[in-house]
Amino acid sequence: MAIQIPSRLLFIDGEWREPVLKKRIPIINPATEEIIGHIPAATAEDVELAVEAARRALSRNKGRDWASAPGAVRAKYLRAIAAKIGERKPEIAKLEAIDCGKPLDEAAWDIDDVSGCFEYYAELAEGLDAQQKAPISLPMEQFKSHVLKEPIGVVGLITPWNYPLLMATWKVAPALAAGCAAILKPSELASVTCLELADVCREVGLPPGVLNILTGLGHEAGAPLVSHPHVDKIAFTGSTMTGSKIMTAAAQLVKPVSLELGGKSPIVVFDDVDIDKAAEWTAFGCFWTNGQICSATSRLILHENIATEFLDRLLKWCKNIKIADPLEEGCRLGPVVSGGQYEKILKSIETAKSEGARVLSGGDRPEHLKKGFFIEPTIITDVTTSMQIWREEVFGPVLCVKTFSSEDEALELANDTHYGLGAAVISKDLERCDRFSKGLQAGIVWINCSQPCFCQAPWGGNKRSGFGRELGKWGLDNYLTVKQVTEYVSDDPWGWYTSPSKL
């Protein structure tokens, strides 16, 4: 099925603009390794134009057009964006699948979530007005105090390639709901659908400069955005290494950041489980989105009493996963996003073998696919806690396995990581699950499942998985500042100093 990739420019101040230096980057279909189009490559010159446009959007008509407009005004645009994306779902889902390798059914699910996220933040935008001037109870009756919530200003949003449009929406929707003006810099490996978001914003008449979208390389477009003195906040999702660099750059300007970084999340399976149900959740938790999930539960911590039976069943589930072109009906595992990622994942598997681990299944290209960046679902056993495969994020369809004999041992293994994004526990004993969830050092815990995500619930991690929370009301708070306003209401003078009239 031939899909035409739209030829787009940068989106600045409500208009399509050629990059100042006229640079472009090829789009490579990860299923075929073919160049299927190009995206514009922004540089510091384009960042400057986008920042100027964003600041104009905030100050236009003394802020009444956007930043200080009633929340219902902003909600109207967010709902229009949600509706338009819903109308274009079949087209956008196919573009997503072709661009990043995600199976079409997953991409379609993502686009539904995109629309839902814009709708959700439209509701929160409407609710903001009622929260203004919330009174504060004070111990001194001579004073009254209230709180104002105001947009933080111009925000830079840097997003990854595994959920290109959805992860962008997680940042764009709350930022716009709060009244900020935003500059979105998606990953150069998968930017196509973010440029379609720009087209949607044009169609619905979003005020110029409220959302600007700059595609391009991290060091050419992302770095100037982070270090720009007139960008008030950076929100980033991506690798821990890049997140550390962003923190360092932002610190020079004491600029706030929120970071959602890497993970090496555990899934703990006790011996009282329904083995088929637990095996499917284990596979889904690691191989969904081709294994390219920051929260992937890629460390299976398995009770020794059921280890042999469970792994045998898990292998059968994995062999039943259809690996194919993302547009092929029934595809459940597509290619990883790029040649670079493909080589990195295979190297991680080879390193595990060289360190003494055993590849129980997978570990290579599927025999029936001669082209594309495809990797079989891979299960690795005989793992020790010092091995790289146990400690470092692979970001591919690779699951490593260790067994345990006691609950305390399982918890120790689960927390044996410098990451802390997600964790899952599977057991029929719900008291144990509750107890275990409290002991897990992670920002997200799943009980008897893995990876479900809802825009109403907070998302974010601990330790080297970053800080700050996206989604829910916490996601909106990311883009708001809190201002205290205190008024002296007594008719009496303050009386601290002696009045000159009494001298």
From Swiss-Prot:
Location of the protein in the cell: Cytoplasm, Cytosol
Enzyme Commission number(s) of this protein: 1.2.1.-, 1.2.1.19
UniProt: Na(+) binding residues: I28, D99, L189
Major location category of this protein: cytoplasm
Cellular-component GO terms for this entry: cytosol
Annotated metabolic or biological route of this protein: Amine and polyamine biosynthesis; betaine biosynthesis via choline pathway; betaine from betaine aldehyde: step 1/1
GO terms, molecular function: 3-aminopropanal dehydrogenase (NAD+) activity; aminobutyraldehyde dehydrogenase (NAD+) activity; metal ion binding
An individual GO BP term: glycine betaine biosynthetic process from choline
Record note on pH: Optimum pH is 9.75 with 4-aminobutanal as substrate.
Keywords assigned: Cytoplasm, Metal-binding, NAD, Oxidoreductase, Sodium
Catalytically driven reaction(s): 4-aminobutanal + NAD(+) + H2O = 4-aminobutanoate + NADH + 2 H(+); 3-aminopropanal + NAD(+) + H2O = beta-alanine + NADH + 2 H(+)
Site (Transition state stabilizer): N162
Domain of life: Eukaryota
Active site as annotated: E260, C294
Pfam families in UniProt: Aldedh
Leading EC class: oxidoreductase
Tissue specificity as recorded in UniProt: Expressed in leaves, flowers and fruits.
Residue numbers binding NAD(+): G238, S239, T240, M241, T242, G243, S244, K245, C294, E393
Protein role: Dehydrogenase that catalyzes the oxidation of several aminoaldehydes. Metabolizes and detoxifies aldehyde products of polyamine degradation to non-toxic amino acids. Catalyzes the oxidation of 4-aminobutanal and 3-aminopropanal to 4-aminobutanoate and beta-alanine, respectively.
Family per record: Belongs to the aldehyde dehydrogenase family.
Protein name: Aminoaldehyde dehydrogenase 1, peroxisomal
Species: Malus domestica
